[in-house]
Amino acid sequence: MAKEHICIIYGGKSAEHDVSLLTAQSVINAMDKDKYAIDTIYITNDGEWLKGPEISETIEDSERLRLSHIERLSISEMLNVSSAGKAYDAVFPLLHGPNGEDGTIQGLFEVLDIPYVGNGVLAASTSMDKLVMKQLFATRGLPQLPYVSFLKSEYEAHKDNIISLVEGKLTYPVFVKPANLGSSVGISKCTDSETLIHGIEEALQFDRKLVIEQGVNAREVEVAVLGNDTPETTLPGEVVKDVDFYDYKSKYKDGKVRLQIPADISEEIQSALRDMAVEAFKATDCSGLVRADFFLTEDDKIYINETNAMPGFTKFSMYPLLWENMGKSYSELITDLINLAKERYKDKKNIKYKMD
């Protein structure tokens, strides 16, 4: 049987560039090499696109995927024809953060009419923007913690007023977050005015729009969602931390976080979380995959935190492990996502774009 031609796109002009390399290594190694011919495209930190070789062997070190300058091709040439001279059956973007999971590259795939894994333009962009995401969750009646948002220009013009607004609406501790980054990049836990100002100024290095959320003493539980119009969910898992909060360093470097799968919670709460995860998936018109993150308090109150349209996706990340607990292997999950991409593309092809 002829192999399907899949293009893995990784790297990206983002603070989460190195995370993307780890993800690409993990996915490439897990893909069924008898079923798929795997091409690669590396996007440098400066935004340059480099066409990599077809890969059929195991990648032992993610640094091998950090390509140097090679033959220059146009982006459309890279995306439209595989190394074997055939059109791709699907592209698989493994990009985190701005320019990768925020709808921009998804728009490129749409314009070039290429099947791609994961969420579409609308879902990717709204899931990346924490403020827009919260506004959409509100339309579905999903419970959320109080928050304040503002722009860099507003903070620079009215710093004292912004601080007063935060302290008037929220109580310490609070969490300062760039609106458009993932992997906990730029997030700070703030316990007083001094740390709040420092946290704001740190976060503004990564984004022009910030969200400041009420801190809460709660467990962090997550549900994986997979599908298109009729998504399936997993049992919830829990992020168990040996640190004050789950930042970039504890996620990827220190090993101070462990995942409990499934989470030790009642069947009633499990069911409620899974239902809310589907509501969140639908609120942002998602497809393919999403990880829905929640806070669960001691008195069993549930608050949705966010949806992640391109969740951590190494073999040891929460999303694949949640599915492994449900009996779906990492390799099978990748195959399912590719098939969902082709299914969605086929459905779009049946849409009329002109009147008879």
Curated annotation (Swiss-Prot):
Name the principal localization, coarsely classed. cytoplasm
User: What NCBIfam families does the database record attribute to this sequence?
Assistant: D_ala_D_alaTIGR, PRK01966.1-2, PRK01966.1-4
Q: Under which EC number(s) is this enzyme classified? A: 6.3.2.4
Record's catalysed reaction(s): 2 D-alanine + ATP = D-alanyl-D-alanine + ADP + phosphate + H(+)
The family line of this record is:
Belongs to the D-alanine--D-alanine ligase family.
Localization recorded for this chain is: Cytoplasm
Q: Which BP terms does GO give this entry? A: cell wall organization; peptidoglycan biosynthetic process; regulation of cell shape
| Residue stretches making up the ATP-grasp domain | 134-339
Record's keyword terms, sorted: ATP-binding, Cell shape, Cell wall biogenesis/degradation, Cytoplasm, Ligase, Magnesium, Manganese, Metal-binding, Nucleotide-binding, Peptidoglycan synthesis
List positions binding Mg(2+) 1.
Answer: D293, E306
Query: Which cysteines does the record link by disulfide bonds?
Result: none
- The entry's ATP-binding residues are 167-222
Q: Does the keyword Nucleotide-binding apply?
A: yes
Function summary:
Cell wall formation.
Question: What would be one Gene Ontology cellular-component term for the protein?
Answer: cytosol
Task: Name the pathway it acts in.
Answer: Cell wall biogenesis; peptidoglycan biosynthesis
Principal EC category = ligase
Q: Which source organism?
A: Macrococcus caseolyticus (strain JCSC5402) (Macrococcoides caseolyticum)
Q: Which GO terms describe its molecular function?
A: ATP binding; D-alanine-D-alanine ligase activity; metal ion binding
Query: What does the entry's cofactor note say about binding and number?
Result: Binds 2 magnesium or manganese ions per subunit.
Among its keywords, does the record have Protease?
no
Entry superkingdom = Bacteria
Q: Which residues bind Mg(2+) 2?
A: E306, N308
The entry's protein name is: D-alanine--D-alanine ligase
Task: Write down the required cofactor(s).
Answer: Mg(2+); Mn(2+)
